[in-house]
């Protein structure tokens, strides 16, 4: 397993899947990577891997929309390093189950909308990496269609297409409509970037780094001139010598240190 922050934090699904390629694949620890995939796959429930494993004897928690999608991305990287499609074949039924649950609906309002995009969220529950919560107050709730979640969803579908082709099954997993809906609805022409969130009340124009996932995942959703504009926007508003801000200083909600 991987610990999110020894000794304060235990196993977190999101952190594990994001860190796994760097910790296990680049370093040649492929057996350990395989064991981690198996451990999380064994705890898939209603199409979701755990957000975290609490202390011994306690049930896993599932309040995350992105950890399960990062599982696909990490597995794809594993296959690029190992070519171990026999292992992917073992996970294939679980992967198909995950996609089915996301299409029909699972916990916390996570489901595919009529446009093919993934929507998620309910009051009082934090589901994305922006998961700060003070008492009952979710600081950044992001209920609706977050930009990075839909980039991850698109990548999960493209990875399913790749695996289906390898396994001689129907490779049409519905990725193309997601790409079309994403580019139509997330593009913010006013700033030359992507909306951070789509909601029934309208899009959220907050300039955040989440939009970068539409460019940086294995299967990019945005390319060419739009991609260049996004990078320029992020560089102008978010880049610092210490990394990326999570919100543009021009935003009314921005709080400096």
Where are the regions a protein language model picked out?
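Short acidic alpha-helix initiation/capping motifs at coil-to-helix transition points
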Residues: 11-15, 155, 173-174, 207-209
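Short coil/turn segments at secondary-structure boundaries
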Residues: 24, 58-66, 86
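Extended glycan-interaction surfaces of carbohydrate-active proteins
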Residues: 1-11, 35-57, 61, 68, ...
């Amino acid at each position: 397993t991987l610990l999110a922050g020894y000794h304060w934090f235990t196993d977190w699904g999101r952190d594990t899947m994001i860190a796994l390629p760097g910790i296990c694949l680049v370093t040649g620890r492929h057996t350990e990577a395989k064991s981690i995939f198996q451990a999380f796959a064994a705890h898939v429930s209603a199409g979701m891997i755990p957000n975290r494993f609490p202390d011994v004897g306690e049930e896993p928690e599932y309040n995350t929309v992105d950890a399960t999608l990062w599982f696909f991305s990490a597995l794809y990287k594993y296959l690029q390093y190992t070519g171990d499609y026999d292992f992917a074949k073992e996970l294939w039924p679980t992967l198909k189950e995950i996609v089915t649950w996301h299409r029909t609906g699972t916990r916390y309002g996570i489901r595919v909308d009529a446009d093919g995009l993934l929507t998620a969220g309910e009051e009082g529950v934090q589901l994305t990496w922006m998961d700060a919560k003070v008492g009952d107050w979710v600081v950044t709730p992001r209920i609706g269609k977050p930009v990075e979640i839909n980039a991850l969803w698109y990548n999960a579908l493209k990875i399913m297409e790749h695996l289906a082709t390898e396994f001689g099954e129907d490779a049409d997993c519905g990725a193309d409509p997601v790409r079309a809906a994403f580019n139509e609805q997330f593009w913010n022409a006013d700033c030359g970037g992507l909306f951070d969130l789509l909601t029934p009340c309208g899009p959220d124009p907050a300039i955040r780094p989440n939009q970068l996932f539409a460019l940086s995942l294995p299967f990019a959703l945005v390319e060419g001139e739009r991609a260049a504009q996004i990078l320029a926007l992020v560089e102008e508003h978010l880049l610092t010598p210490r990394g990326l801000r999570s919100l543009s200083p021009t935003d009314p909600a921005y709080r400096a240190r």
